[in-house]
From Swiss-Prot:
GO terms for molecular function: glutathione transferase activity; protein homodimerization activity. It catalyses: RX + glutathione = an S-substituted glutathione + a halide anion + H(+). Disulfide bonds: none annotated. It is an enzyme of class 2 (transferase). Its EC number is 2.5.1.18. This is Glutathione S-transferase. It comes from Asaphis dichotoma. Glutathione binds at Y7. It comes from the Eukaryota.
Length: 15
């Protein structure tokens, strides 16, 4: 759900 989208967002922001 939303948590998946957030996970990707955090990954992209961290990269």
């Amino acid at each position: 759900p939303s948590y998946k989208l957030h996970y990707f967002d955090l990954r992209a922001a961290g990269e």
